[in-house]
UniProtKB/Swiss-Prot annotation:
Gene, per the UniProt record: MAPT
Outcome of swapping residue 289 to A: Risk factor for PSNP1
Record site feature (Not glycated), residues: 24, 44, 67, 381, 391-392, 394, 465, 497, 507, 541, 557, 571, 574, 584, 591, 607, 611, 615, 628, 634, 638, 648, 657, 660, 687, 692, 700, 702, 712, 755
Residues that bear Deamidated asparagine: 484, 596
Crosslink (Glycyl lysine isopeptide (Lys-Gly) (interchain with G-Cter in ubiquitin)) position: 44, 571, 576, 584, 598, 615, 628, 634, 638, 648, 660, 664, 670, 686, 692, 702
Effect of residue 515 to E: No association with plasma membrane
Protein known as: Microtubule-associated protein tau
Result of altering residue 5 to H: In FTD1; reduces the ability of tau to promote microtubule assembly and promotes fibril formation in vitro
Stated consequence of mutating residue 548 to A: 50% Decrease in microtubule-binding after in vitro phosphorylation of mutant protein
Residues the record lists as Omega-N-methylarginine modifications: 472, 666
Domain observations: The tau/MAP repeat binds to tubulin. Type I isoforms contain 3 repeats while type II isoforms contain 4 repeats.
Tissues with expression: Expressed in neurons. Isoform PNS-tau is expressed in the peripheral nervous system while the others are expressed in the central nervous system.
Organism for this UniProt entry: Homo sapiens (Human)
Length: 758
């Protein structure tokens, strides 16, 4: 098998980085998962997928370019626009992962890291000459992108991109979708190739149509395409070829990431867990049957997790298919691996199981070495389309269990010798290297292809710890050689670390059922013809399932397991302090006896001042106060004392002689004294003459009030003649003529006043 493994530079964010030698980046199309319209447009734009000279279209490169970290919008947005329901439906059927599919195949076990997704998901299909960009890195963008891609791939079931898409989309779901929109044919082709790997017969047999389970296939294709070139011509089948209603919810919930599996979209951890749980390595038939069912009829979501050794069903197809896809595991396993991962995804996320019709393209000259892989695919229709989902689930469960046993480490940490993509390894969650026989790059491809499913399974399953994903590297050496042809290292975590959850498989089964109807066209091969359109209503279920699984059972248990509080032992309860029962209680460290001891005071000395010390003599000897009468005989009294009445001050005796002075002779009495009564002041005797002032007569009113004062001069004779009356004129002037006496009186008054100084 000429499987030129193309070295993928895995850029977590660049699906385009999956630069498969054969793959050509189809125009830098970036699908915006957020835009549902992009789904149709992107799918319709699949012309962007220009078939490589090999004829392999590489939508993945664009996806790589477009690959971006999943955004809430991307994750939230429906993967496929309702406008492209047909396309989505067509793509969805492949979404379902047959239970037979191993986790790695389904991409469940391997939650391809962005790098893995970038490098590992895009596998060149050297044989087909087409680099199927299985690793369309899905941005965790809206599932719509994945749906868009799915829509672009008629054969690819539109897997809800719930957990897985969220996981894988970070790798480039958005770009993947964009490319899917542009390179819908490529995506379909790649997915078909992935499905071919899954189914065994390449999708190419499907006429370049995406197998219905293209998304699931995409997960597987991611692994398969990475591991082996996909023979199928670029999946240019019209995105709506299947005419399936976009199973946006389903894709979102589950393996739609698987679709970007080619885009290496890491599955949500919970999703991976679920897928792992549901991924018991199913026989390759399981996935094939599931796919066929998915294509022929709506997938029955029967979750039988029977771990059966991966039977290399369709090994002839698988070998050819893997030869094309360089898928280490038999094509059936590749599909199965995808199927389990997608099936798991479907279970987990109700992803439509990618129909195994696409594997029809698997028959190529290349032998497909089959890597036993946990098949997490839900019971999808087998390539024949006859396999019941239940059978697939059971087979996948058995195979996954066996695969798990066989594959202690699903994730090939070491890049396959053929794989030049070192980045892919880092992204592979599984630590254990896969057996050298199985090319790790194949695992990585499968992981990428199924990684969406696987990643989602991991995310969902609390068993994510369990390395359930089928070791893609466990493929026989022949497969490894094929894988080597595909240079994609199996960096994508080949094994879902979460063991398949028995509880989740039913969900996957339902998704598988959806996928199966969506991909009735290509049950056995990755035919570009998308499976029957899967009802988009299933997508919501898938999404819900996918989102719920993330909770680890341990955490739930821890929450639920609350130790019951034992009932208090009331019999042994003692009363509290202060209760009536404690009335006699004596606190303290025991009984304290207060003993009344009489002190022996005989030796005690009383303090100073006590009655006992009345006779006490202070130290220093006894002091006797002797009363001595003072001898006052020699004492002289002080001055002024009675004893000194007769005392004469020193300095000689002073005699005071009283002389009787004859004042009368020598002294003149002061003025005013009795002696001076007769005294006449100097200037001679003055007589004070008293003059009777007759002011009334002389008075003159200052204000003339018109009244006449009749003054009867006493001097006037008894004559009462009115003319003797002084008539005061209204002017107040006295008629001096009438009263000549007034003139003299006035003169006298003025003179007296002058004398007195008035």
């Amino acid at each position: 098998m000429a499987e030129p493994r193309q070295e993928f530079e895995v850029m977590e964010d660049h699906a385009g980085t999956y630069g498969l030698g054969d793959r050509k980046d189809q125009g830098g199309y970036t699908m915006h998962q957020d835009q549902e319209g992009d789904t149709d447009a992107g799918l319709k734009e699949s012309p962007l997928q220009t078939p490589t000279e090999d004829g392999s279209e590489e939508p993945g490169s664009e996806t790589s370019d477009a690959k971006s970290t999943p955004t809430a919008e991307d994750v939230t947005a429906p993967l496929v626009d309702e406008g492209a329901p047909g396309k989505q439906a067509a793509a969805q059927p492949h979404t379902e992962i047959p239970e037979g599919t191993t986790a790695e195949e389904a991409g469940i076990g391997d939650t391809p890291s962005l790098e893995d997704e970038a490098a590992g998901h895009v596998t060149q299909e050297p044989e087909s000459g087409k680099v199927v960009q299985e690793g369309f890195l899905r941005e965790p963008g809206p599932p719509g992108l994945s749906h868009q891609l799915m829509s672009g791939m008629p054969g690819a079931p539109l897997l809800p991109e719930g957990p897985r898409e969220a996981t894988r989309q970070p790798s480039g779901t958005g770009p993947e979708d964009t490319e899917g929109g542009r390179h819908a044919p490529e995506l379909l082709k790649h997915q078909l190739l992935g499905d071919l790997h899954q189914e065994g017969p390449p999708l190419k047999g499907a006429g370049g149509k995406e197998r219905p389970g293209s998304k699931e296939e995409v997960d597987e294709d991611r692994d398969v395409d990475e591991s082996s070139p996909q023979d199928s011509p670029p999946s240019k089948a019209s995105p709506a070829q299947d005419g399936r209603p976009p199973q946006t919810a389903a894709r979102e919930a589950t393996s739609i990431p698987g679709f970007p599996a080619e885009g290496a979209i890491p599955l949500p951890v919970d999703f991976l867990s679920k897928v792992s749980t549901e991924i018991p390595a199913s026989e390759p038939d399981g996935p094939s049957v599931g796919r066929a069912k998915g294509q022929d009829a709506p997938l029955e979501f029967t979750f039988h997790v029977e771990i059966t050794p991966n039977v290399q069903k369709e090994q002839a197809h698988s070998e050819e298919h893997l030869g094309r896809a360089a898928f280490p595991g038999a094509p059936g396993e590749g599909p199965e691996a995808r199927g389990p991962s997608l099936g798991e995804d479907t279970k987990e996320a109700d992803l439509p199981e990618p129909s195994e019709k696409q594997p029809a393209a698997a028959p190529r000259g290349k032998p497909v070495s089959r890597v036993p892989q946990l098949k997490a695919r839900m019971v999808s229709k087998s390539k024949d389309g006859t396999g019941s989902d239940d059978k697939k689930a059971k087979t996948s469960t058995r195979s996954s269990a066996k695969t798990l046993k066989n594959r202690p480490c699903l994730s090939p940490k070491h890049p396959t010798p053929g794989s030049s993509d070192p980045l892919i390894q880092p992204s592979s969650p599984a630590v254990c290297p896969e057996p050298p026989s199985s090319p790790k790059y194949v695992s990585s491809v499968t992981s990428r292809t199924g990684s969406s499913g696987a990643k989602e399974m991991k995310l969902k399953g609390a068993d994510g710890k369990t390395k359930i994903a089928t070791p893609r590297g466990a493929a026989p050496p022949g497969q490894k050689g094929q894988a080597n042809a595909t240079r994609i290292p199996a960096k994508t975590p080949p094994a879902p670390k979460t063991p398949p959850s028995s509880g989740e498989p039913p969900k996957s089964g339902d998704r598988s059922g959806y996928s199966s109807p969506g991909s009735p066209g290509t049950p056995g091969s990755r035919s570009r013809t998308p499976s029957l359109p899967t009802p988009p209503t299933r997508e919501p279920k898938k999404v819900a399932v996918v989102r719920t699984p993330p909770k680890s059972p341990s955490s739930a248990k821890s929450r639920l397991q609350t130790a019951p509080v034992p009932m208090p032992d009331l019999k042994n309860v003692k009363s509290k302090i202060g209760s009536t029962e404690n009335l006699k209680h004596q606190p303290g460290g025991g009984k304290v006896q207060i003993i009344n001891k009489k002190l022996d005071l005989s030796n005690v000395q009383s303090k100073c001042g006590s009655k006992d010390n009345i006779k006490h003599v202070p130290g220093g000897g006894s002091v006797q106060i002797v009363y001595k009468p003072v001898d006052l005989s020699k004492v002289t009294s002080k001055c002024g004392s009675l004893g000194n009445i007769h005392h004469k001050p020193g300095g000689g005796q002073v005699e005071v002689k009283s002389e009787k002075l004859d004042f009368k002779d020598r002294v003149q009495s002061k003025i005013g004294s009795l002696d001076n009564i007769t005294h006449v002041p100097g200037g001679g005797n003055k007589k004070i003459e008293t003059h009777k002032l007759t002011f009334r007569e002389n008075a003159k009113a200052k204000t003339d009030h018109g009244a006449e004062i009749v003054y009867k001069s006493p001097v006037v004779s008894g004559d009462t003649s009115p003319r003797h009356l002084s008539n005061v004129s209204s002017t107040g002037s006295i008629d001096m003529v009438d009263s000549p006496q007034l003139a003299t009186l006035a003169d006298e008054v003025s003179a007296s006043l002058a004398k007195q100084g008035l």
